[in-house]
């Protein structure tokens, strides 16, 4: 009788043990990496720079971005560590821990790019226009920061809220810095349509930051011509006697079938003290995207933007950017730039993309040290990138 009773009991215990093991979260680990191989030819752009501190455009090739890293997951926990080796310089990239509270909420802490504007949904190597718009770079819209971020992502609404310390907090300790700048920002999006081949969303992002430059009483903003083979300064604004900064960027995304339109406007106001006038700057960009080969664009719900097109798709991207970094009332003339570009992207497979880009970029009203007041350049770039 005891054997008859014990036998089913043992079977039940074994089954319960097996079920417990099956429900136990599995630890996963995955290597990651990327390599970008660029080549560029510059047509003109070097006139009237003799005797100035302007750099020359030089035709050439480069590997501007090379990274190796690892992703790990365990149940609702995720982690990532990414190290960059671009131009032979070693630097820490994304390094964070993430916890999924539920299907609609997550918290991320560490060193990463927080949500701010439409461009925050793609990494630097996945910009459809080859490089990020100049306005996005100049307004320091998507830097990597030591931050804590909460994401709400459900149905028609997306909200990302972040508190952060300045980027130098990853390079220096607090005593060495003397003081740490801080800030808070949010990205708010409404997307009444958000399915593959049919999406429309509008949103706005807001940021407040304390000064990071000098002895934490200034802001230093700059951007290069949109090329990483030759790095040549385009805009520069050094704003001293700063008390704090407010910036915002409304965004628009429309996608229908194999065509899409995206745009952002940027506005920045730096409050100043000691009787100095506030500094104001603004900019905007727009991109028209179309699949020449491929069925339709897809929507990425988690990123709140467009997903990478399917393998063997060919895409054309027409882009225009305007940035005004000169403010006469503040006595700061960082420059005014226009950029028009045409980019072809061929998505070879899941891991490889080939890009070809033509761009015309000019700058005027630039009164920075002994740089030329105005300058322009035409250039053609090609890139092969591998990302896994």
Residue map of PLM features:
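Sec-dependent N-terminal signal peptides
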Residues: 4-14
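Sec/Tat signal peptide C-region and signal peptidase I cleavage site
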Residues: 16-20
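Outer membrane beta-barrel
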Residues: 24-43, 56-169, 176-212, 290-292, ...
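Outer-membrane pore/translocation modules
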Residues: 39-53, 120-122, 126-130, 201, ...
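Flexible, solvent-exposed coil segments and beta strand-coil junctions
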Residues: 47, 73-78, 125-131, 162-168, ...
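Extracellular loop and loop/strand-boundary signature of outer-membrane beta-barrel proteins
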Residues: 51-56, 82-83, 132-136, 167-175, ...
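Outer-membrane beta-barrel pore domains
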Residues: 220-388
